[in-house]
Amino acid sequence: VILRGGSEAINTNLSLSKLIQKSLITNSVDPHSVQIISDTSRDLVTELVTTDKYIDLIIPRGSKELLRFLKAHSKIPMIKHLDGNCHVFIDEFADLAKALKIAINSKTNRFGVCNAAETLIVSKGIACEFVPKVVNELSKKNVTVRGCDQTNKMVSNIETASEADWHEEYLGPILAIKIVSGIDEAIDHINHYGSHHTDAIVSESKKNQNIFTQAVDSSSVIINASTRFADGFEYGLGAEIGISTDKIHARGPVGLEGLTSLRWVVSGCLLYTSDAADDRCC
């Protein structure tokens, strides 16, 4: 394992690496099995990500700029932890008391995390009743609301959402609200603007729950629960290195199991394949 951090935390990283290596020695593991690179220059990263002869996998954690750089230069496969533009969809068949608690928790439990909700989507059938209530609760939490045109007609003193807002991972006390005609438009919005991270539906309709889970192309799809449950510990995976939005190998919260692969061992007693192409017996 090779660890390479940024210049802003190099002293902390060096101290942590000493603790890791001390722990490895205590447990009779080669201390060189975990190494840290003290050089924080970008040139070294460019060189490192082309050494596919020696490195099997890169797990980048950082800015969008870092991920774009690695995508352009790396010759090594990556498990990427990208944006968390997460949505909560309040279906027309939702229990609105549940919906209010789920929406508020998804947004305000912690702002600066990747599984916090950034857009609330509300079916027009219950919007007139639900939207004013949720905006009122959000205001108590000092959350700025940016709404679509229909939202602005229902409540006052909120900002108007722009096209950019639907793409945005705010990581702060801002929430966009979109009113849609129904579940189909909600799914289209999520698949178009979302980051395939975590998206939730609040609904008492089993039919709509199934439609949503089948059609929303995200690593975690949640029914009647907060988006904050998209987490390695909550899924029983233990500590995670990130939440992958890729579709190859590990997807969603990536723990130790997600970093492993299979190796097949065949044990026999004079087992051999037949020479005949149509004979599959050993």
Q: How should each PLM-predicted stretch be described?
A:
Residues 1-93, 128:
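Rossmann-like NAD(P) dinucleotide-binding subdomain of oxidoreductase/dehydrogenase enzymes
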Residues 66-172, 223:
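ALDH superfamily catalytic-core signature
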Residues 89-92, 121-124, 180, 202-204, ...:
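Short beta-strand-to-turn element immediately C-terminal to the catalytic PLP-Schiff-base lysine
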Residues 120-122, 172-181, 196-201:
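Short, well-ordered beta-strand elements within core beta-sheets of diverse protein domains
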Residues 272-277:
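Conserved small/polar residues in nucleotide/adenosyl-binding loops
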